[in-house]
């Protein structure tokens, strides 16, 4: 199974400067956990201490926004994820 997670430049220092990391998993959450297993330094950049997605992390699965309560959504071979931080200000 090949699922790709696209890593933004500001998180690449935590993935050994990899822009794309291939992961395995049957759900979005499992794929994110596999990312953390391969790149442990990114863990606290996307999850809080309870293992919940940080509220400023945004995930897109094949171009579709995934809400924090949809992490159990199925993932399949060929999927591509994009991670982003949501920035605010005024």
Each language-model region and where it sits:
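Ubiquitin-like/PB1-type beta-grasp interaction modules and other compact soluble beta-rich domains
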Residues: 1-89
């Amino acid at each position: 199974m090949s699922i790709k997670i696209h890593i933004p430049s500001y998180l690449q220092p935590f993935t050994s400067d990899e822009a794309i990391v291939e992961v395995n998993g049957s759900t979005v959450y499992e794929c994110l956990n596999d990312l953390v297993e391969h790149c442990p330094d990114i863990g606290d950049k996307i999850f809080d201490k309870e293992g919940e997605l940080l509220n400023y992390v945004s995930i897109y699965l094949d171009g579709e926004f995934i809400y924090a309560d949809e992490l159990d959504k199925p993932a399949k071979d060929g999927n591509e994820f994009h991670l982003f931080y949501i920035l605010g200000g005024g």
